[in-house]
A protein has these predicted regions:
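Acidic, PIN/NYN-like endoribonuclease modules and their adjacent C-terminal/linker elements
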Residues: 1-12, 16, 21-24, 37, ...
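Acidic, metal-binding active-site segment of PIN/NYN-like and related structure-specific nucleases
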Residues: 50, 54-67
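Conserved BB-loop
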Residues: 28-40
Length: 122
């Protein structure tokens, strides 16, 4: 049985080159700035991502943590939220790819994960 791959939506503050780099590696990744929704509030962003079955990768922990709590309490489904501290582009790419290789869409669904869980062991 094959595992469904994660589809990602990168929030507008994430390095835009990440979408291109991951797409070139065969992953389904889009950047918010390429969707016509730049500047969208967080709730509509999550609604948009959920409707497309896309997990959101964001640096915006301040707004997304309480938003996800509200969605959890309301039993609203989403494809997952990945929170991250700001990282250099190479590190961001490595950790994002490690996440995409490690988890399936089903494992990420309705969860919140830290991208830093997927950093290389030192």
């Amino acid at each position: 049985m094959s595992r469904a791959a994660i589809k990602l939506l990168l929030d507008e503050h994430i390095w835009q080159g990440l979408a291109e780099a991951l797409t070139q590696r065969g992953y389904d990744v889009i950047h918010l700035n390429d969707t016509g929704h730049r500047g969208i509030d967080d709730e509509p962003l999550l609604v948009f991502a959920a409707a497309q079955g896309r997990a959101v990768l964001t640096y915006n922990t301040r707004h997304f943590v309480p938003l996800i709590r509200l969605w959890y309490e309301a039993n609203r489904e989403h494809a997952g939220v990945i929170l991250s501290v700001q990282l250099p582009s190479g590190e961001l790419l490595n950790q994002a790819e490690r996440l995409l290789v490690t988890l399936s869409a089903d494992e990420l669904k309705n969860t919140v994960r830290w991208l830093q869980e997927f950093q290389a062991d030192t």
